[in-house]
Amino acid sequence: MKMPKTIGLVHFIGIGGIGMSGIAEVLHNLGHRVQGSDQAESANVQRLREKGIRISIGHKAENLGDAEVIVVSTAIKKDNPELIAAREKFLPVVRRAEMLAELMRFRNAIAIGGTHGKTTTTSMVAALLDAGGLDPTVINGGIINAYGTNARMGAGEWMVVEADESDGTFLKLPADIAVVTNIDPEHLDHYGSFDAVRSAFRQFVENVPFYGFGVLCLDHPEVQSMVGKIEDRKVVTYGENPQADVRFHNIRMDGATSIFDIEIRRRRTGQVIEIKDLRLPMPGRHNVSNATAAVAVAQRLGIKPEDIARGIASFGGVKRRFTLTGEWNGARIFDDYGHHPVEIKAVLRAAREACQGRIVAVHQPHRYSRLSSLFEDFTSCFNDADTILLAPVYSAGEEAIDGVNSEALVNRIKAAGHRDARHISGQEALAPVVAKIAQPGDFVVLLGAGSITYWAAALPKQLAEISGNRA
């Protein structure tokens, strides 16, 4: 049974979150009554208000009003006053992924999973379905630049969603097509072991119906290992690997544009389809790989090669994925969400491919627990940066861990052989340092999942003020 329209007023606790806001927006567009609360004003809160959704700032029991259904994310603590009030009223409390699953039942669904690259790949799949005239509904974990939002209601029969594996609830999503970009040891606080992470992703793919299929990256060792274990489900592989069903090759760069060819091989018939000279307006092998995942989905849905090429060429990117925030003295300043060593390494490698000058990486580590568990990986992920500026850890509410901090990481990076790694005290120290070292042609790349995005937005103006020029 599909979710009826008569469920009553739906209240989102933490409605401004990137995942929650998208679900709230689509529910609203479907005709449901929606309201919510959040701790602070934000762009997402403002956008939802403009659509007519009532939002309270601060969490108070009275915010519930006449709500009959409560939606929460894993970020909401058990002592939240609205959650306590909801349970006292015996109201149904629904996890974010459960509500997303209900929305997916209205459409044929494509779920994009993986430790890294989900948001960009979700956006690319949506772009190719758009180019093919399929007009999908989209719920993403980041702002899609072409839409100006992370969610969009389409008139077509397909829905494209980002599947968040962090708390295991992605296994509730009723996907017809499941994409896995990679599998790394993340979220071990929830899973307990890497083997449990592996098992969850295998189940994610095997959950698709017999008429669906999985799309798996053959370049990632963990995913390739999983391919051979998938039972009784169709699998399409992709990547640079010569054995992949959908293979990218012949990559070259034109400034910040990646040019590449794709070869699609049908296992049963032996048919080979080639799409040459695809132009993706983003640098980086990882972005070409994500685009190839989108091609693997699109070609199976019957989208023509010329529409695929057009969709890739017009792809507008995702906010906080190598987003240009401004220029100063010929140096370009970028904002990126990368906060895991694998992501940081990929972003800096892409920057190196596109940049004619030097790379200045500014990183704000996100969570003491992540820095502690991946400390050695962090020491080697900045190799493509000529200069590294490390800010204090963004705690995200965690307690500090003795010996786990940015100063210790700087020392370890230097000991591992990096020529120029420095610690900065915070945002106020950033612009003066960058003003001294950035030169025309350089890229200054700010990386992290915390408040560093605001630093990236402010930095061009701060640099202009230092130099006495107007931005």
From Swiss-Prot:
Major location, coarse class?
cytoplasm
Binding site residues for ATP: G114, T115, H116, G117, K118, T119, T120
Q: What class of enzyme is it?
A: ligase
Keywords tagged on the record: ATP-binding, Cell cycle, Cell division, Cell shape, Cell wall biogenesis/degradation, Cytoplasm, Ligase, Nucleotide-binding, Peptidoglycan synthesis
Q: Which GO terms describe its molecular function?
A: ATP binding; UDP-N-acetylmuramate-L-alanine ligase activity
Its annotated compartments are:
Cytoplasm
Quote the pathway field.
Cell wall biogenesis; peptidoglycan biosynthesis
Q: Which Gene3D superfamilies match?
A: Mur ligase, C-terminal domain (3.90.190.20), Mur-like, catalytic domain (3.40.1190.10), NAD(P)-binding Rossmann-like Domain (3.40.50.720)
Reported function = Cell wall formation.
UniProt record similarity statement = Belongs to the MurCDEF family.
Q: What is this protein called?
A: UDP-N-acetylmuramate--L-alanine ligase
Q: Which organism is it from?
A: Sinorhizobium medicae (strain WSM419)
Gene, per the UniProt record: murC
